[in-house]
Amino acid sequence: MSNSAPAVEACTKIITFLAECEQEIGISEISRGTGINKNMVFRILNTLENEGWVYCNAQKYSLTLLLFGLVSKPLSRLSLNTIASPVLYDLLNKTGESTYLGILKEDKVLYLQHFDGVKNVRVAGRVGGEYDLYCSAPGKVLLAHAEKSFIEEYTSKALEKRTKNSITEKSALLQELENVRKNGYATDCEEFGNGITCAAAPIYDYSGKVIATVGCSAFTTNGECMEMIEKFLPYVLSAAKKISLILGAK
């Protein structure tokens, strides 16, 4: 037996549908788009209009700013650090490796949080530290989702080859960034430092914009890079999705 409330479920479907519409829309279109019969759509819209949630103009409906005001209140009380902390700890417990939260600061990735792995082996990284974008997994995530003009300017400058695996040639780096966007994550196999392996994923806000990155770092030896990444990448992706959902991402 289902514990769901059909009227509430229908209401949330209508609100979600209206939020995705770029213009005012009529009852017939809402009914087709949501799969809810017209009579139910009309009654729900009438209730939402009375409560100030939707606006009706010539029998076409749109959401009012009331909903956005309600949503912004809890978000304004939550900082990215507050939201991410328990998720990072969970990621640390599941992988045993160092975890971090980073944002773009000018042409670097800035670590807002960094927790050492349970093995007590300190991987490069500290809260407040700033690191290159092109040769680190979190950096590549942020660079890949930056403005096109910024990417062009950044990839056109001379980049230091920190290790033999660092990608410094423009065309190769642009292809790497394309792969990051396509795959939904970035990896770093000893590109930042010898023996250091990383995987990172983007964090999205309610508008679909990448605002941060979360990931894991570990020490690897004897060519274990990809094996290590395969081990903790699913947890990294799950952590990024969890934070994004709290921020209102779809």
Residue locations for each model-derived region?
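Short amphipathic alpha-helical signal-transduction/dimerization elements
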Residues: 19, 139, 143, 147, ...
